[in-house]
Amino acid sequence: APEFPPYIVPIRAGRKVPPFPEAGVIVVADSLLASRPELLDDIIAWGPQCALFDEAHRASTWAGKRATADRNLSLSVSGLSVPMTGTPFKANPVEVTNILALSGHLGPVFGGASEFIERYATKDRFGGWMPKRKMLPDLERQLTAHCWVRRNKQDVLKQLPPKLRTTRVVDIDRKGFAQAHEALYEKIGLWVDEMLENGVEITQEDIKVYAKTHIEIITPLRAAAGVAKIPAAIEIVKDWLQATTETGPDGSKVYTRPLVVWVHHSPVMEALKAAIPEDMAGIGFIDGGTPEHKRQPEADKLQNGEIGVIFCSIMAAGFGITLTRSSDVIFIETDWTPANISQAEDRVHRIGQTETCMITTLLAVDTLDAHMRAILRNKGKDLNVLMPGADNNVTVMTAHLNEAAGQYEILTQEDRELEKDFKSVPDIIERIVTEIVLKRTSLPRAA
């Protein structure tokens, strides 16, 4: 652990709390504040004059223990309370409510939590929060005028080279995806049959409730799409290594153009590890099973030229590590949240990068890939209003065959229909459930 001067006191999990300085700084994880109320009480009794909350978006759930502990600490300080984050919004205005409470602006500027939420958010047909799009420009104006000091990445890191995005459609063996599809339909069918056997006439409202409360059932279908893309991804990686690996003067391998490959689901990472040929050398992994203290050392193998490809989990390696020796990124899978994708991209596109970064997303037809991109486009549009100039358009292509004409992405009519119909995960589930119910009953189609 690093050494600190006596006036800086870090509090670490699993260790005895050291004496507080008469005057100085206490550094503590918000997870400890949430899990140890007596520690929070002791810090409040210490009488801090100001409080800084790093990564404040981690406490975006108003009633959560972390958010409640942060607010209690914020209310106790006599001076400034400053929340800091690069991602205040992930999808809707409700997520910033607690951050505004920490900064002291929620009441004076917006009249409190209830008034803020009523003004800027509404509930969708599944009961989830979504923005009132007409009010987003007003929210951005209020935040800029009264609440936040905000700088975009390109304004701060002007020396960074461009980050370009493109897609690549790959052929897949549909067997595994079809099996997951059938399993999903069978699971939903059991619910439908049970309802019908109990004499329940299934309404559209019943379907909405089911969709809202069973979001997890879509995960195996997403993972199956990722697994189905693995053979194509491995061929790409093999070709990449063959084209970019040279032999140095001492006979060692030199990886001239390292590659970062991202996945999201654990089953996809496990299937990837199992499918990689035994003779494929020069590769590394960072996933949920990699201890946090070993993640950057694993990344350093790529940074130091020891490996030519690293396979990473978005949630395990999408933040806090540096992979700037690479400027090429492939996503076998992505995420529902634009910020999680751009954070993963920025493991290569950050201070120290000197090359143009090329981000390639692998897509498979007749899977959920198109639906995911529709949802991401919708979220990106809202986030662009709230945070102009931020990196929210993770599906917008900036490298395309028509680049010379200034046309980076061609959206088909089908893409636009998907964007209209699918704004959240429950929308996808509702469509599937409705299809199954229609096959078993005479439920009228929704308008």
Regions found by a protein language model. Give the residues of each.
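Conserved helix/coil segment N-terminal to the catalytic DExD/H
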Residues: 15-23, 30-47
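Conserved helicase/translocase motor-coupling segment
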Residues: 154-275
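Conserved helicase ATPase core of P-loop NTP-dependent helicases/translocases
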Residues: 280-317
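Conserved helix-turn-beta segment of the N-terminal RecA-like "Helicase ATP-binding" lobe
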Residues: 1-12, 106
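SF2 helicase motor core recognition
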Residues: 35-36, 91-93, 269-273, 296, ...
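Conserved P-loop NTPase motor "coupling/switch" region that bridges the ATPase
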Residues: 49-53, 67-154, 353-356
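Substrate-gripping "pore-loop 1 plus following alpha2 helix"
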Residues: 58-73, 338-339
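A conserved SF2-helicase RecA2
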Residues: 336-345, 349-440
